[in-house]
Amino acid sequence: MSLDLINIIFGMKVRQARLEAGLTLTDLARQAEMSPSYLTEIEKGRKYPRADKIVKMAEALGKPYDDLVSIRLAPSLRQLETTLSSTTMQRFPFEEFGLEPADVLGLITREPERASALLHAVVEIARRYDLREEEFLRAALRSYQEMHENYFPDLEDAALRFSAEFGPRYGFDETMLPTLDALSTLLRQEYDYTIDDRALANIEELRAFRSLVLPGRRPQLFINSRLYARQVKFILAREIGYRYLSLKERSLTSTPDRVDSFQQLLNDARAAYFGGALLMPRGRVLADLQAFFALPAWEPGRFSAMLTTYGVTPEMLLYRFSELIPEFFGIKLHILRFHHTAGSDEYHLVRHLNMNQLLVPSGIGLLEHHCRRWLSIRLLPDAPGAAADPLPVGVQLSEFLSTQEQFLCMGFGRRMVLSPQVASSVIIGFRVDADLRATVRFLDDPNIPRDIIHETCERCPLTPEQCTVRAAPPALLEARREQMARKLALSQLQARYGTGD
């Protein structure tokens, strides 16, 4: 058991005993001959007092010394102990959200038995859906990004400083974008990298990785030769980000086999952000977005042309949009990325960033079928190969059946380079409100397809005649209707015969 957990359990016991004894912090501090501020630190699990102080605290609280220092909790609180000692709790990035474990503890100790029952339920749900610690940490990262609206000025400034420092030597600035050759030469000359673009593709077990790094005095960067130039550019720019930002704790492969900490995920995200800002400079992207939003009619060619302008993939472009649009245009947005394997009827949400409270059923282990009318889903069956140029663009004005909320969505679908049997779609969506109408002139273009959508087929009330792409019967909707019918029948029975009093 870690020292921190011992502190936390001791602090929880002291606080509970003090409340049971009806003592204020000042009362107990005076009787135990310590300052109220020091007692506060003890109750929050930050400090552990000397034995003589514990003796005085035990006397003031009317508790045996051994009971107070024991790390055993009451049976009803055992789940609390298990949760507090879990690696997820120990490694959760509370500080990134302005919290400490003790702050959470303060909430728990107000109703410890109820909190223990709740945590037990959460643990059981996690077991039911086989949730891994990595998924909790990724959810924490997503929340952290959404909390900051995915805009980080320090990383924007770092990318600008880097361009000003190294751009003149390697032929790029905010108007001249960095080339693949410039980035690879920079990595070799400034950071002493060796770059290999043959080995990965020739090793069967490693062919699925886009890149792999072997750190050392002279780092080795392995890049899969099957990737396209725009993908390689991002790998190089991200690798520069790790070095320029001095990010030590990081993933060594493009898709990490294991996640050891939140800091690893955060550093990966910071390096990727830097890489995107380097390839797509803020000022230039904002000017292009301003011109695009000012178009009087929807022009898919202008949208897809930005892929060529910046030499990036759809995911890179739309993710860069998500970093700049909320901050500089005041528009809330979401990004969804789905995968679909040929021959399968399953669609998997593999990445999302949700800054406009979109109703996205995204739980791990979701046994429902996403609405087939979503643009994200519609782009997948006919997705072209990744080499298609230009990639076809999808656009849709979607209206939720249940809330009448509207979202303008646009994006791309294509097949994965390293897994051609997998189709991937990525879309960016904007909530239709006064801010969007004031910004996007082509919003009401009649050439933009419109459709009614829902969350999942299992929740949708549309009849087969109203929806021809339903993938599953409305089982959850019918179950809810049956429950409401039973509730109504029970109320009618009570009204007719009384409650029996």
Feature-to-residue mapping (PLM):
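Short juxta-domain linker segments that transition from a proline/glycine-rich
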Residues: 2-9, 16-20, 26, 30, ...
